[in-house]
């Protein structure tokens, strides 16, 4: 199996850098051809919830796609083109539309990572009101989902990947804070929602579970403690 997770220009203005996003599509096709040349039988590509745009309901494989930025547009195109290329090369293809993943080794610019760093420094993080309903999946569980997709996924399938449950974002943030120090303040409501703020994000993992046997195993409280522990080791070495 070949797992393609690489992607450039994933944050900020880079998400609408159209020439750069087109290069990401090209790299995905290159990855398919490389996988075939290596003798791989299945190509597992990682897409994004950004392929859907803003949706009020639970995300399924057949939920209409209406991406609102170049990143989401390119992910959608890469999934479609790589599926066609894989078929032409006689290779199975599975596409994961990943929602929000957290865990050790996460990038510093995610909301989870930035909030952890602020709280570990004893500072009050500036946040939105946290009313968004969100679906978070621990990184080890996400890796398990991709592995199961390679082993048991249906060729040509698209699988939304998440925990399958949604909670208000402020609840996740409060759980995170409580794992560090109950007394630390949170700046909930200090940042306004952006013009394209997604207010509901939840994956329907019914098909993923049926086809592959996947089930999330890590509660957020446990996963965030492991993430904080890792962040503390990074703070000590820097």
Task: Write out the residue ranges for each language-model feature.
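NAD(P)-dependent short-chain dehydrogenase/reductase
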Residues: 57, 80-135, 139-148, 173-179
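A short helix-coil junction within the Rossmann-fold of NAD(P)-dependent oxidoreductases
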Residues: 9-13, 34-42, 152-153
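Structural signature of the Rossmann-like NAD(P)-dependent dehydrogenase/reductase core
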Residues: 4, 42-45, 53, 94-100, ...
